[in-house]
Amino acid sequence: MPKKGNFKQKKKLRNRGRNVDPAVRDNLIQLIDIQDFRRDHLIEYLHVIQDKIGYIDEKHMTALADLLDISQTEVYEVATFYHHFDVITNGTSKPQSLTVRVCDSVSCQLNGADELIENLENYYKGTVRIQRVPCIGRCQSAPAATVKFNEVDKADLKKIKTIIDNKSFDPVIPDYIGMEEYIQDGGYELYSQIKTGKIKKESVVEELKNSNLRGLGGAGFPAGQKWEILMGQPQPRLFAINLDEGEPGTFKDRFYLESDPHRFLEGMLIASSVVEIDKIYIYLRDEYPAVRHILEKELSYLKDKFNNTIPDVELRRGAGAYICGEESAMICLLYTSPSPRDKRQSRMPSSA
């Protein structure tokens, strides 16, 4: 007999009783189209299912849990927490094949959102789902709506009907300063000088501290002090960038990302070089599909430009949860935690 306290504990059978439909499982593998499934990419996989099928049912969640080797409960908790996932369970019907999201936040309310919703509901009579949603960050062009991924400024029934009739569901990409134009105007010169040591990292931090630049998330924490604290942390060091702005009237991030994205990307690389970052996560709210398209494209160009010498960058997509603008909730989303927020005591804004 083994000595007391020296026995091996049986492996926990988390997935016992799971009935996986092989056809659904194979379909998900083809749909998601990757070799190695990652637990922390659960939300990304749920987005693929939602985008391509239009809803997420119990068979999808069971198969996804099997592919990730996690419990069905974990998948269900994550899928049902975020508003942009349509989860179908026993007793609930599938949503209409097309959804029009109409912002009913303050700016849009004042510019006719209620009338627009009424007109759409009267015209489509249940054949298209008309959904009231919180601020989508297009307050300057209220009332605003989205038809799948097509963002509609100064929306009215005629505009939305034309989009639906023409099946113009992709995001409309605005004109913006691309990488070559940005480089011709001196872009990435500062980053290159810091990376090669022509400009010392300590002098960058000192300049940042002297500028008194502060975070805009509410606490107003000095950016230079935050960088300095992080430089003293043990490695590996991870960089999480919060591009969520759900407050009505707030769309500063969308404005510069849709007009001058490389100014943001160079700032990201400067910070990563000074602080010696190992990996970067960009959390982008799901309400900005055009920005997502721009960043995916320009990040690819950026990696080629610097011969893959920049840190690994993961662009992560939100799913309609206002709370993820808060730092610990954002980090929980990056980990794909079923819990929307870390309820531990507040820490310095440079640690997680």
What are these regions (language model features)?
Residues 1-58, 62-65, 72, 77, ...:
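Iron-sulfur (Fe-S) cluster-binding modules
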Residues 48, 53-132, 136, 281-314, ...:
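Small-residue-enriched alpha-helical segments and adjacent helix-cap loops
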Residues 98-100, 106-124, 140-164, 224-233:
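Iron-sulfur (Fe-S) cluster-binding segments and ferredoxin-like electron-carrier domains
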Residues 185-188, 242-253:
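Gly-rich Lys/Arg/Thr-decorated short loops/hinges at beta-loop-alpha junctions or inter-strand turns
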Residues 210-227, 321-330:
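Conserved phosphate/anionic-ligand binding catalytic regions in large, soluble enzymes, centered on
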Residues 261-273:
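Histidine-anchored nucleotide/phosphate-binding helix
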Residues 335-342:
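Conserved small/polar residues in nucleotide/adenosyl-binding loops
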Residues 346-352:
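Hydrophobic alpha-helical segments, chiefly the membrane-spanning helices
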